[in-house]
């Protein structure tokens, strides 16, 4: 099993330096990668077209999630769409998620939309300290 503590320390130090107390989902994936913890395929897109390209590359269905250090509860903010099955749905979903996020928190810093391979089974894990 991988154990890259230096990478994890850099990630956590950068989060702390920015004044945050939680990781974004992509930062969490980097931590998982550093420790060899398998996670679904994913990427972050800043445009609807880029999101559709990511989704096509990993295969449908996918999950779309807002990426913002200011929105911790993505589902509550309308920032999650599951079972997205086509490029057209990805593009429409991208716009919907951004609109929902801005409505939920107008001042939120939006880093993009995470496109993630949809997998069945497993267990969602939230780690806190």
Regions found by a protein language model. Give the residues of each.
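ATP-dependent carboxylate/acyl-activation modules
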Residues: 1-129
């Amino acid at each position: 099993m991988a154990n890259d503590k230096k990478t994890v320390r850099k990630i956590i130090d950068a989060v702390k330096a920015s004044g945050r107390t939680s990781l974004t989902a992509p930062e969490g994936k980097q931590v998982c990668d550093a420790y060899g913890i398998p996670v679904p395929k994913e990427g972050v897109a800043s445009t609807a077209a880029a999101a559709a390209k990511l989704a096509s590359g990993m295969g449908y269905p996918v999950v779309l999630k807002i990426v913002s250090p200011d929105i911790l509860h993505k589902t509550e903010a309308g920032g999650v769409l599951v079972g997205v099955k086509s490029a057209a749905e990805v593009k429409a979903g991208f716009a919907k998620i951004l609109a929902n996020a801005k409505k939920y928190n107008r001042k939120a810093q939006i880093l993009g939309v995470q496109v993630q391979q949809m997998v069945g089974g497993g267990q969602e894990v939230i780690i806190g300290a």
